[in-house]
Every structure is written in structure tokens, then in C-alpha cells.
Amino acid sequence: MVRNVIILGSHIQALGLARQANTIGVEVILVIPDRYSVAYFSNAVSKVLLYSTEKELYGKICSYKTNVKETLLFPTNDEMIEFLVKYYDEFNETFYMGIPKPETVTLFSDKRNTYRFCEKNHIACPHSWYPDTIEDVKQIADEVDYPVIIKPSIMYSFHKLFGKKAFRCNDKNELILRATAIAKRFP
């Protein structure tokens, strides 16, 4: 039986999760890197744990390990999902996991894997290219119909860097220029 939920991350979803858990009598522990979370101010949260490094985050979660599964780990953003995937086997022994098995997460968190899965199984998805170099982009630039978008395979680190989820390119020159600029900052 779930007695506690550890909500990982400061996404707005944390507030809704905290309120729902509190409504059914589950203790809510919010684990965030800073105080910039609306859930931080909620009376539905019984405890807030701040961390500054992954090692510190790991230690704070491990301090809630028990012999009986009674705590649910629930991420609210891609960064926290990636963290739980990294420690999935260890945490799954003592916590309920708010994510599926790592192979499922990997299939759907990386758009290259998702789109390839869809194509293989005849599921409609955007036509996509996966260039590794600017030379690949130049070759693709002659094959596509414009406008196109440049979108990363994994969103959260791209969005942190550029403040956008995608870039629209209206022609070949714009595609090559944007891809070159992105490649300099986002390997």
C-alpha cells in the first residue's frame, strides 16, 4: 500500500499530484532543485527536500528506502524520468515506480526510437530524418518539402538550451544555417 509519494521535479504537474495524493491521505514529499515550484507553497506538501547535485538527489531518495514498499517515486519532467531510469533496478526493489520499465521509457522518450517503432509497425508518424553531420543536413535539404522543423530526439536538454521545442525552417538555406548554429551548441 502506498503511504508516501515522493514527487520529483518542479513542473506544474507536481501541484496537481500533491493535491490528489493529499486528498487520499498519502503523505507528499516534494524533491526539487530550487524553490521555483508552485507546489513548494502548497499545504498539500508535507515535506520539501532541496538538492543541488544528482548525488545529493540520490542520497535523499535512498534515505526513504524501507524493507516494505510503501513509497511511490513520481517524476514530473524528462530529467527526473531519466534519473529514475538510471537507478530503476535499485529503486524498484524498495519503491513503487511511477514510470514503466526502462526499455519502454527509452522507446518513447527518444523520438528517433519512437518514430522508427511507428514506421516499423505501420503507425502514422511525422516523416523524419536523423542526420549525424551538417553534410547529412545538406543532402537532406535537397530532398524535403518546406517548411520543415528541426526538433531534437530528446526534448528537455534542447529546450533548456534554446528555450524552444523546435525551429521552423522555410527553405534550404534556413535549414542549413539553423542546423549549423544548433550543432555548435547542442552536440
Regions found by a protein language model. Give the residues of each.
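Short gly/pro/ser/thr-enriched loop/turn and capping motifs at secondary-structure boundaries
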Residues: 36-39, 103-107, 156-157
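ATP-binding N-terminal substructure of ATP-dependent carboxylate-amine bond-forming enzymes
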Residues: 1-101, 135-139
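Active-site nucleotide/adenylate-binding loops and adjacent lid/helix of ATP-dependent enzymes
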Residues: 107-187
